[in-house]
Amino acid sequence: MGCLGGNSKTTEDQGVDEKERREANKKIEKQLQKERLAYKATHRLLLLGAGESGKSTIVKQMRILHVNGFNPEEKKQKILDIRKNVKDAIVTIVSAMSTIIPPVPLANPENQFRSDYIKSIAPITDFEYSQEFFDHVKKLWDDEGVKACFERSNEYQLIDCAQYFLERIDSVSLVDYTPTDQDLLRCRVLTSGIFETRFQVDKVNFHMFDVGGQRDERRKWIQCFNDVTAIIYVAACSSYNMVIREDNNTNRLRESLDLFESIWNNRWLRTISIILFLNKQDMLAEKVLAGKSKIEDYFPEYANYTVPEDATPDAGEDPKVTRAKFFIRDLFLRISTATGDGKHYCYPHFTCAVDTENIRRVFNDCRDIIQRMHLKQYELL
């Protein structure tokens, strides 16, 4: 009887265990279902584009607009990067003065020792940013020869934020310097790898993936292609007269066009539409109005280009700027309309990534497009 009693208890225990297992399975399935629904409800945006096109600045704008911006500690951590931008900028300009053809001399020969000092600190990685350094930078930036070399920066590789920070050297050099949001947007740090930013707009979840744009970073892009709602392709329109860092030969805008074409025609992406951010419109306008670098010298077809009748210029926009920006837009649209089979589309927008209001407006305009892409992705449309 003892044996029978024991077996009965074991059977009872097994029943309890089975019930607990079923309950546990139900909980797991419920959680998985919840995660599946959350995954389906999330809009995944992949930011692509050539190096230095402004992708990371777009991500920073999303943080400012939708993730409570940057806290004091994060701002403090960026001070060193900003001062490194100042150092890189002045080192690059001063070094280029003797290498560009024809070379540019210092306007004030008394600044020679300052130039020598800047060149001497160039290789130092853990540099201490002393007041002596900032004083030399300020004096050199005031030198007309240095300014003349800066004006020819398309002949060498100079970070976009050079002028911005060199003109703000008094603020950046302060002991109690606190970067502004605009300083953080302008700060240049090379993106290596894949960075994900999560944010919510009107209760809709967005995941934005920022991938390094340099050639050796692009092989990582394929890891992000799975289940992407849309691609935001960022092109630096002001780069029409510049060459890429990787080979100092290939035109940057041509590189961006070639990259766009390879993404547009990629067999894995033939159903994913592209939102095209024609970026750096502020810098494009400056170059066009300065008249020193003519677009037709780099893109001969510009000489015969006519602005489309349906083109809408911005209020007060110079016709030369309107013509330039629509020409570059049409270079990209020519690629997207040549192929596509109606399975994916290209939606162009003129952007200035450092202008928070511009990005707010453009992203709001894009949200309906992204929503339609998302519904189509899960065959709900």
From Swiss-Prot:
Residues 1-25 are annotated as: Disordered. The keyword Membrane applies. It is found in: Cell membrane. A lipid is attached at G2 (N-palmitoyl glycine). Residues 41-381 form the G-alpha domain. InterPro entries: Gprotein_alpha_S (IPR000367), Gprotein_alpha_su (IPR001019), GproteinA_insert (IPR011025), P-loop_NTPase (IPR027417). A lipid is attached at C3 (S-palmitoyl cysteine). This is Guanine nucleotide-binding protein G(olf) subunit alpha. It comes from Homo sapiens (Human).
